Amino acid sequence: MAGQPSHMPHGGSPNHLCHVLGPAHPPDPQRHPNTLSFRCSLADFQIEKKIGRGQFSEVYKATCLLDRKTVALKKVQIFEMMDAKARQDCVKEIGLLKQLNHPNIIKYLDSFIEDNELNIVLELADAGDLSQMIKYFKKQKRLIPERTVWKYFVQLCSAVEHMHSRRVMHRDIKPANVFITATGIVKLGDLGLGRFFSSETTAAHSLVGTPYYMSPERIHENGYNFKSDIWSLGCLLYEMAALQSPFYGDKMNLFSLCQKIEQCDYPPLPGEHYSEKLRELVSMCIYPDPNHRPDIEYVHQVAKQMHVWTSST
């Protein structure tokens, strides 16, 4: 394949990844008339602008020249990642996205290796994310109406329920990973830290994710399961109501932050602005013992009921 490096960091090779992803070959529009072809190349895209970046990746808004659809093109410098685990996470992200098919989850479209980079083609959600909406309301010194909170939260719960039903845990649910389309549809993205669990085990021990949203069992690497996503959902629901994380204030002091998380020490939500049901659900999700947190089916059911109730009042 053109552009492959002559030597590789320990733990991976282009040939190994090409075996995982499949060989690149010219697109065949007749084979997939309504979608991107199975293997694209950079020549099939007109890149417009950079819209995001990570430690080893950059995300661009691009147009697919095959069908003129606007997409997100994530370019990952996979061969510059010195640690094999980071490379495995990128391949894992592709595997997770392939399994998931839900209107509230960013859709995987294609992937290919070119110019020593792994290119992942994703559905574009171009109207911003939940963190931007929270910042906007905070700047305006306004609270988000409860009906709006449930409108978005119920969609997020639907996405997480789909993931959990496929034995996939997100592991980094936070406002910045909850994208919103121009028509108000939630799209949960950034599955790079997600972990696929077999039916035999639901425990993992690696410390990943965003500290403000990490549950006590995750911080201490004592083993955790899908209930850690429930903790993060509770933190996100709280932040939509309070306009800040429940454990905000100790970003520069990890020890103090961990203490707050262990003790579930966070300010109460204003009872005069939000329903008892919302505050109750937050406290159920942000609970120190994962065995006593509700599952995603329960959280989603409450969200659906509250969405219907607040929409009709």
UniProtKB/Swiss-Prot annotation:
PROSITE patterns associated with the record: PROTEIN_KINASE_ATP (PS00107), PROTEIN_KINASE_DOM (PS50011), PROTEIN_KINASE_ST (PS00108)
Cofactors that this protein relies on: Mg(2+)
Reactions this protein catalyses: L-seryl-[protein] + ATP = O-phospho-L-seryl-[protein] + ADP + H(+); L-threonyl-[protein] + ATP = O-phospho-L-threonyl-[protein] + ADP + H(+)
Swiss-Prot/TrEMBL keywords: Apoptosis, ATP-binding, Cell cycle, Cell division, Chromosome partition, Cytoplasm, Cytoskeleton, Kinase, Magnesium, Metal-binding, Mitosis, Nucleotide-binding, Nucleus, Phosphoprotein, Serine/threonine-protein kinase, Transferase
EC number from the UniProt entry: 2.7.11.34
Notes on how activity is controlled: Binding to NEK9 stimulates its activity by releasing the autoinhibitory function of Tyr-108.
Name listed for the protein in its UniProt record: Serine/threonine-protein kinase Nek6
